[in-house]
């Protein structure tokens, strides 16, 4: 079984931090690929012993704010 998750990746110093928006599971890596691979593994471990809950649809967008 597979499930699609929405993730955000940010560069913090020398690391890329990948975070799942549905459940706040996060991981990091020296490259974006490493961060997403590590997050995939973390999510598999997170849901290893339980069934997947029903997640609400997540929408991601950008907005401009005058500062």
Regions picked out by a protein language model, each given a short descriptive name:
Residues 3, 8-20:
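Short aromatic-glycine-(Arg/Gly/Cys) micro-motifs in beta-strand/loop hairpins
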Residues 15-38, 47:
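Amphipathic, hydrophobic secondary-structure cores in small proteins
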Residues 1-8, 37-67:
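Short, charged, surface-exposed hinge/linker loops at domain edges
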């Amino acid at each position: 079984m597979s499930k699609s998750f929405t993730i955000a990746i940010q560069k913090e110093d020398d690391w890329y931090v990948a975070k799942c928006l549905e459940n706040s599971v996060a991981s990091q890596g020296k490259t974006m690929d490493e961060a997403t691979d590590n997050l995939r593994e973390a999510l598999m471990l997170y849901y290893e012993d339980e069934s997947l809950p029903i997640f609400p649809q997540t929408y991601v967008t950008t907005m401009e704010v005058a500062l």
